[in-house]
């Protein structure tokens, strides 16, 4: 009814007081008890998300050209899943539809030739809202490089070890995520490790990818503590990546953080400018988010977009395996860099 629809929660509501889920989930309903005046208040929720707007339907007769970015980010899906599992309703800024679509595989036909690295999969179906219209679905599939085909990888792991990363779903989960990555590396690859908190530093100089013990030892000694000077860590990571630059390989920084940069010289525009400039030197920056309450998705998205990398969110060990193991080739090795076919445009 009309009155009933008014009582339904709107997507813009960031938190709901009660959520009842059928099946194996238990209703997240607060008991009817008086608040404890002596209770210690929890940490405030400071999660930040980029503002989103809904694209309107456009007439192709008036606007025949549509431009869109070919991104493979999937952070919004995993983060929304985390919120739902906590009994919370994701807000409209937290749900980016294209990242929900990116999360799944669609069994599109794989390109057979790396020199023609995209296949086009087109289907036509009747429109569900107008029997006189049809809908065209265009799916693009990129070329998947095998382990033997891929180039060497110069990977700098940039880990946030500030106090905000102490929770089990932050630095401890980030360490487990890195462990799932290591079996994909070999002697062609080099791994470095930079950490940042109140200050930044190198904890692992360039090390061959098959020297797993050295990499694990450097990582397992890390503990979370202190404030977050993220900008300094990023600049140091770029310096280390440049020192070990692989001309015929892929040079990438992987930032693992909750995005809560809270001390130091942190000018978002300056940081984005630095990253965009470094992008031109052939060094990619990908961002992997962890945790909640202070998760800064807005910063994460801006860094990844300016760094020509991907943005993903890790909420479980299963998701870590998907990103760093199962989709290792997809997430680490690009098949094209801002190419444009001048002869066809």
Question: Where are each of the predicted segments found?
Answer:
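Extended, small/polar residue-biased N-terminal targeting/export presequences
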Residues: 82-85, 89-135
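Negatively charged
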Residues: 36-89
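N-terminal plug
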Residues: 23-35, 52-58, 90-91, 108-111
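Exposed acidic/Ser/Thr-rich ligand/metal-binding surfaces
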Residues: 4-5, 114, 118-339, 344
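Short, surface-exposed loop/turn motifs at beta-strand boundaries within globular domains
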Residues: 14, 61-63, 73, 131, ...
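N-terminal secretion/transport leader regions
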Residues: 16-25, 35-37, 304, 345
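Periplasm-facing N-terminal accessory domains of Gram-negative outer-membrane beta-barrel systems
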Residues: 1-17
């Amino acid at each position: 009814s009309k009155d009933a629809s008014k009582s339904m929660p709107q997507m813009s509501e960031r938190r709901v007081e009660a959520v009842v889920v059928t099946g194996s989930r238990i209703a997240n309903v607060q008991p009817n008890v008086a608040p404890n005046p002596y209770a210690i208040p929890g940490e405030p929720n400071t999660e930040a998300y980029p503002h989103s707007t809904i694209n309107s339907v456009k007439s192709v007769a008036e606007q025949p050209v549509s431009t869109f970015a070919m991104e493979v980010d999937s952070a919004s899906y995993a983060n929304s899943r985390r919120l739902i599992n906590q009994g919370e309703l994701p807000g409209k800024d937290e749900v980016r539809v294209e990242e929900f679509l990116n999360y799944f595989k669609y069994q599109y036909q794989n390109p057979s030739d790396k020199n023609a690295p995209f296949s086009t999969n087109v289907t036509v179906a009747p429109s569900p809202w107008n029997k006189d219209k049809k809908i065209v679905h265009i799916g693009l599939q990129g070329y998947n490089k095998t382990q033997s085909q891929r180039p060497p990888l110069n990977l700098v792991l940039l880990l946030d070890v500030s106090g905000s990363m102490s929770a089990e779903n932050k630095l401890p989960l980030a360490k487990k995520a890195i462990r799932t990555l290591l079996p994909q590396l070999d002697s062609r690859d080099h791994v470095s490790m930079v950490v940042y908190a109140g200050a930044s530093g190198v904890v692992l100089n360039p090390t061959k990818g098959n020297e797993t013990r050295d990499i694990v030892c450097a990582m397992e000694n890390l503990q979370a503590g202190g404030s977050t000077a993220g900008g300094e860590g990023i600049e140091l990571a770029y310096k280390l990546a440049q020192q070990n630059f692989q001309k015929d390989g892929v040079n990438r920084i992987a930032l693992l953080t909750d995005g809560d940069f809270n001390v130091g010289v942190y000018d978002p525009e300056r940081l984005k400018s630095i990253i965009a400039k470094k992008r031109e030197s052939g060094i990619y920056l990908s961002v992997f988010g962890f945790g909640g309450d202070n998760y800064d998705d807005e910063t994460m998205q801006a860094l990844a977009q300016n760094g020509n990398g991907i943005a993903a969110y890790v909420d479980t060990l299963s998701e870590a395996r998907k990103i760093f193991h199962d989709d290792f080739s997809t997430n680490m090795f690009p098949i094209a860099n801002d190419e444009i076919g001048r002869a066809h445009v």
